[in-house]
Amino acid sequence: SLDKWGLISLLPKNLIRVGIYEEYFKKPKAGILTLNNVKLEVGKMIYAKKDGKWICTSIVSIQLNDKDVDQVDNGEVGIVTDIELEKGYEIFVKIE
């Protein structure tokens, strides 16, 4: 099919890629991302994709430099979600 060859993208136009979970910890459902000018905040919905499977979940908490923060847009951060994911998930957010 055309999407397998990279000729078309089925990614909705209102989603932007944040990054890939570089590490994942089952407890407390936390993933590590490196952000580059993409705003994440507690309560925001994120969309995760791996092997063609999409999951929608919300951010429960965010850590930057081992401190809890309400929002962040740069750096290596840890985010806790309400649904368990795993290493390798691509993370997306909706453009408002």
Label each region the model flagged:
Residues L11-E96:
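Beta-strand/loop-dominated core regions that host nucleotide or nucleotide-derived cofactor-binding catalytic loops
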